[in-house]
A protein has these predicted regions:
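Conserved C-terminal alpha-helix-loop-beta "cap" of PLP-dependent enzymes
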Residues: 309-426
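Glycine-/proline-rich flexible loop or hinge segments
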Residues: 54-64, 86-87, 326
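Acidic, PIN/NYN-like endoribonuclease modules and their adjacent C-terminal/linker elements
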Residues: 38-42
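Structural motif
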Residues: 86-90, 113-116, 171-172, 205-208, ...
Length: 426
């Protein structure tokens, strides 16, 4: 039996297969560039692990207080080496990316301080953390003020607006690297470095924190290599390599990470406590696999862009642009298009492939959200998934794929569902 015959049994028509094959021929150069990036980052991870003498003992579980957990502590040294920082906090007790960001903000902002976003509104789930939407326990409730500077019409930074917004109260600047549920560009490490340098010129002691979610290992450098004081992310995204069952990380300056550790546990305890509960093998091996897993996800994003831009849909970024994160936005023009696309992604999943995704009122979001994810780890967006809020311009956000071939199947299935619904013609 041929591969195409297997695909046919899974519901992918020859028309879709032929279309996909034709599209693939045009993106070979992008795939070569992605492979080169993966090779660089793989070498970086191996070097950090070798320098820190990873051994089988580092995979041992710890319980209770977690005192003297060398596996946990060594992993944090490895993260610090990869990110070029003084320290890192890498813990299963950090439950998600939003939690990691909330932790970093709450640890380093005090009453009377001001938080500034120079890239417009933050990701939806941070609205409650900051207090944009009144929420118990928010930064606003603790007397931390917030302001944001909108991007210019072309998606670039409004430097004059940023200069005007920075004042004596501005303590921390939060920069979201990835587009989130928006159709603005995601930013390169070089662009982030330019923005951080400008902010430091405006106020030398301001803390610059980058929300690094979805961007790790997509480029050769990380934001902390170009001046960021902290980089924050989730282990069920890129750096967990699809194996980490939970967790988050914060890498940065020692004093800032120490404050994060005290906020995560308790003042006086900090990083000395926090049992690993047996997740170290997954954390280490997931990090080891992450460069190639991220490369697979980026290839899937490029293939998605190439297919849908050929059909006349607006895609951000285009198939020819150099990638800055693993997310691919496709504006599908209608609620029906979003639903059909997500049904295709779900149908390609190894887990819950029989489930039909539908829009629902998801906590933390103002609009209904549709999510397709047949994942081994719940909510792991490094695994093949697609989601988006049901609102204009009806953009769906495709990400993940632990292997390129799974990402490819997901795209083909999305095309098939769109074709079956009469929403595209091939």
């Amino acid at each position: 039996m041929t591969t195409n015959e297997l695909y046919a049994q899974m519901g992918v028509s020859q028309k879709v297969l032929d279309f996909g094959a034709a599209v693939l021929e045009g993106i070979v150069p992008q795939f070569a560039r992605i492979d080169a990036m993966a090779e660089h980052n793989q070498a970086k991870v191996i070097q950090a692990m070798q320098e820190n003498r990873v051994a089988a003992m580092h995979f041992n579980p710890s319980t209770g207080y977690g005192y003297d957990d060398d596996g946990r502590d060594n992993l944090e040294r490895i993260y610090a080496r990869i990110f070029g920082t003084e320290a890192a906090l890498v813990r299963p007790q950090i439950t998600c990316g939003t939690h990691a960001l909330a932790l970093a903000l709450a640890a380093n902002l005090l009453p009377g301080d001001e938080l500034l976003s120079p890239v417009g509104a933050p990701y939806d789930t941070l609205a409650g953390v900051i207090g944009i939407h009144p929420t118990p326990g928010s930064l606003a409730e603790y007397g931390v003020s917030y302001r944001q500077v909108e991007l210019l019409a072309d998606g670039t930074f409004d430097y004059e607006g940023i200069r005007a917004a920075i004042n004596e109260k501005t303590k921390l600047i939060t920069i979201q690297r990835s587009k989130g549920y928006a159709t603005r560009p995601s930013y390169s490490v070089e662009q982030l470095g330019q923005l951080i340098s400008f902010c430091k010129q405006c106020k030398k002691d301001v803390i610059c924190m980058v929300d690094n979610c979805y961007g790790e290992f997509v480029e050769m450098d990380e934001p902390t290599n170009v001046g960021a004081d902290m980089a924050v992310g989730s282990l069920i995204k890129n750096l967990g390599g699809g194996l980490a069952p939970t967790g988050g990380y914060i890498c940065g300056r020692q004093e800032l990470i120490d404050r994060c550790a005290y906020r995560l546990t308790a003042p006086g305890l900090g990083r000395e406590v926090g049992a690993n509960l047996g997740v170290m093998p997954a954390f280490y091996e997931g990090l080891f696999l992450a460069p190639t897993v991220v490369a697979s996800a980026v290839k899937g994003a490029v293939f998605t862009a190439a297919c849908y831009e050929k059909l006349g849909f607006r895609v951000v970024p285009s198939s020819q642009e150099v990638r800055r994160d693993i997310i691919q936005a496709v504006e599908l023009k209608s609620r029906e298009g979003m639903v059909a696309f997500c049904k295709g992604i779900q149908a390609a999943a190894p887990v819950d492939s029989y489930v039909t995704p539908e829009p629902w009122a998801m906590p933390g979001y103002d609009d209904e959200v549709i999510m397709a994810a047949g994942a081994f780890v719940q909510g792991a967006s490094i695994e093949l998934s697609a989601d988006g809020p049901i609102r204009e311009p009806y953009a769906v956000y495709f990400q993940g794929g632990l292997t390129w071939y799974h990402a490819k199947l997901g795209v083909l299935m999305s095309l098939q569902k769109m074709l079956d619904a009469g929403l595209i013609e091939l």
